[in-house]
Amino acid sequence: MQRIILSLLILSFTVLPAAAAEEAFDTFLKKFDYETRADMKASSKQLLKLIEEKKAVLLDIRFSEEVKTWKMGFGLQIPLNELPLRYKELPKDKIIVAACPHKDRSSLAMAYLRTKGYNARYLTDGLTGLAEALRGDAAKEFREDTGCCP
């Protein structure tokens, strides 16, 4: 009898979370409309404005080797493959803008975070576009306006 109870407990801890995750993604897709489509994106220009207004946080979801090679100097770094274990580190009161060099991985992170109840977007022009947007005087002004990147 104890084995049956133990087996049922183990089963409930493995099957129920998977079913809940599937249900959350189903709900996200069922509610998907033109407003959601527009709201899930942020350009570099929009991101920088949101950060200056203290409404958003950049989430760099690249592999740690990529981040060690080059980084923005602000935002949070959680590799995409660590996001399921670390998403609770993210603030719930800010827009989370997920970013990678282009936008393939960041769109996955955005969808995942939305199923977890976060107001998440992905960076449409990627970190390469953000680097371009922060050239020269733009970088200086951003640092002065936000106090970031000491």
Regions found by a protein language model. Name each.
Residues 98-100:
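Short, surface-exposed ligand- or partner-binding patches at beta-edge/loop junctions that are enriched
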